[in-house]
């Protein structure tokens, strides 16, 4: 029977269930890792999450690109969904900034009535953090270049721009890992270490997710999945990447520069 409406009624799928199970395994595994030094459940949850993501994305790409299920109303719904998702992420990071300023604007006696707390040697904001800022802002330029090239049907420049964006994302992650390795304090060193590593660590996780998202778009672009008027998968990745850029600017200004 043919449905006389433009909406996509998805088939039954196991991926929401396996995704929820993997989230439970990863969070429980993280707690076990912290308390018992056993990471088996965490690794199993991560593997299940990767399998879920790969298969779910495969299904969505098939429905969108090969079955034509993503009509204009469906695309509009996906846009609203992505906007709501990014809004929820804004609230997520707002909580980290709240925790940071709650501790830094009125340091307690336990912290030595100073910020950074007594005994903490902060990271120089004009070395690796400043380079990271330049790298991430440059990646924002290259992803915009790629988007403009898709709109103007310049496929070669779109591929070049997206490839550069992925490389810059990987470079940022490498620099962040190096900064963590050389850090003079740890996540256990007072509320300064906790707020610094949790906020920048979750941002780094979002950079990894965004880089993966853009890499999938890069593979789709070179296999002719995008046109100048139908490329929301790329647009969603670009929105997410710009969000990651803006969050890093606030992290750099507030935590790396002002907080040091």
UniProtKB/Swiss-Prot annotation:
Bilayer-crossing regions: 14-34, 41-61, 81-101, 126-146, 158-178, 196-216, 238-258
Catalysis performed (reactions): 4 Fe(II)-[cytochrome c] + O2 + 8 H(+)(in) = 4 Fe(III)-[cytochrome c] + 2 H2O + 4 H(+)(out)
One GO BP: mitochondrial electron transport, cytochrome c to oxygen
Compartment(s): Mitochondrion inner membrane
One GO term describing the cellular component: mitochondrial inner membrane
Keywords: Membrane, Mitochondrion, Mitochondrion inner membrane, Translocase, Transmembrane, Transmembrane helix
One MF annotation (Gene Ontology) recorded for this entry: cytochrome-c oxidase activity
Main subcellular location: mitochondrion
Membrane-topology annotation of the record: Multi-pass membrane protein
E.C. number: 7.1.1.9
Recorded superkingdom: Eukaryota
Annotated family: Belongs to the cytochrome c oxidase subunit 3 family.
Subunit field text: Component of the cytochrome c oxidase (complex IV, CIV), a multisubunit enzyme composed of a catalytic core of 3 subunits and several supernumerary subunits. The complex exists as a monomer or a dimer and forms supercomplexes (SCs) in the inner mitochondrial membrane with ubiquinol-cytochrome c oxidoreductase (cytochrome b-c1 complex, complex III, CIII).
Biological function: Component of the cytochrome c oxidase, the last enzyme in the mitochondrial electron transport chain which drives oxidative phosphorylation. The respiratory chain contains 3 multisubunit complexes succinate dehydrogenase (complex II, CII), ubiquinol-cytochrome c oxidoreductase (cytochrome b-c1 complex, complex III, CIII) and cytochrome c oxidase (complex IV, CIV), that cooperate to transfer electrons derived from NADH and succinate to molecular oxygen, creating an electrochemical gradient over the inner membrane that drives transmembrane transport and the ATP synthase.
PANTHER family per UniProt: CYTOCHROME C OXIDASE SUBUNIT 3, CYTOCHROME C OXIDASE SUBUNIT III
Record protein name field: Cytochrome c oxidase subunit 3
């Amino acid at each position: 029977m043919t449905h006389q409406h433009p909406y996509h009624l998805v088939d039954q799928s196991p991926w929401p269930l396996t995704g929820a199970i993997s989230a439970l395994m990863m969070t429980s595994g993280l707690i076990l890792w912290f308390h018992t030094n056993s990471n088996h459940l965490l690794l199993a949850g991560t593997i299940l999450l990767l399998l879920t993501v790969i298969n779910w994305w495969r299904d969505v790409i098939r429905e969108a690109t090969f079955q034509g299920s993503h009509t204009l109303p469906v695309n509009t719904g996906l846009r609203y969904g992505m906007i709501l998702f990014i809004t929820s992420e804004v609230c997520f990071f707002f909580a980290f900034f709240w925790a940071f300023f709650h501790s830094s604007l009125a340091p307690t006696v336990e912290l030595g009535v100073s910020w950074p707390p007594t005994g903490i040697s902060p990271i120089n904001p004009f070395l690796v953090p400043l380079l990271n800022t330049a790298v991430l802002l440059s990646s924002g330029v290259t992803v915009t270049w790629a988007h403009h090239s898709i709109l103007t049907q310049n496929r070669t420049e779109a591929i070049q721009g997206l490839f550069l964006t992925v490389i810059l994302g990987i470079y940022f992650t490498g620099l962040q890992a190096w900064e963590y390795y050389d850090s003079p304090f740890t996540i256990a060193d007072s509320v300064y270490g906790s707020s610094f590593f949790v906020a920048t660590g979750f941002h780094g996780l979002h950079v990894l997710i965004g880089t993966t998202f853009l890499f999938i778009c890069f593979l789709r672009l070179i296999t002719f999945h995008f046109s100048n008027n139908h490329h929301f998968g790329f647009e969603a990745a670009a929105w997410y990447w710009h969000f990651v850029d803006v969050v890093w600017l606030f992290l750099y200004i507030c935590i790396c520069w002002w907080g040091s």
